[in-house]
From Swiss-Prot:
One cellular component (GO) term of this entry: cytosolic large ribosomal subunit
Biased composition (Gly residues): 21-35
Source organism: Bartonella bacilliformis (strain ATCC 35685 / KC583 / Herrer 020/F12,63)
A Pfam family hit: Ribosomal_L27A
Record family assignment: Belongs to the universal ribosomal protein uL15 family.
Keywords: Ribonucleoprotein, Ribosomal protein, RNA-binding, rRNA-binding
Molecular function terms, GO-annotated: rRNA binding; structural constituent of ribosome
Protein name: Large ribosomal subunit protein uL15
Entry superkingdom: Bacteria
Length: 154
């Protein structure tokens, strides 16, 4: 068998039906939409309309809200930081802050701060100046001789 002899199995592919291309095609004129009514018109139907039945979004109770003042943090794993150190993208001679993480390509868009998570292993002694870290991440950092400095204003 050669590459030019490769074929799909019989019945594996179907030809698509072109709608509204004459009565001989089987899907001409009304194009599978029936006759008259809202659903036969262009623009099809209304989203969430259930034919007069009380729609699901009105049957279910309202819940929760979006807090406009909630602070969101960039979450960075220790393993990701170690990869950047190994690749030479992150300089650990100085303390690591948001600007250093952004320059290394670890975070893209800065949110309200950076939070370290404990995924992966950290082998390098690093001093962090960031918004926060999980308890396990703190213990892992302190275990290798590093430290975390969290600003008072947060």
């Amino acid at each position: 068998m050669k590459l030019n002899e490769l074929r799909d199995h019989e019945g594996a592919t179907k030809n698509r039906k072109r709608i509204g291309r004459g009565i001989g095609s089987g899907t001409g004129k009304t194009g599978g939409c029936g006759v008259k009514g809202q659903k036969s018109r262009s623009g099809v139907s209304l989203n969430g309309f259930e034919g007069g039945q009380m729609p699901i979004y009105r049957r279910l109770p309202k819940r929760g809200f979006k807090n406009l003042f909630a602070k969101t943090y960039n979450e960075v794993s220790l393993g990701r930081i170690q990869l950047a150190v190994d690749a030479g993208k992150l300089n650990i001679e100085k303390s690591v802050d948001v600007a250093a993480l952004k320059d290394a390509g670890i975070i893209r868009r800065f949110k309200n701060g950076v939070r370290l998570l404990s995924d992966g292993e950290l082998k390098s002694k690093i001093v962090f100046n960031i918004s926060g870290a999980s308890k396990v991440a703190r213990t892992k950092i302190e275990k290798v001789g590093g430290q975390i400095n969290v600003p008072e204003s947060i």
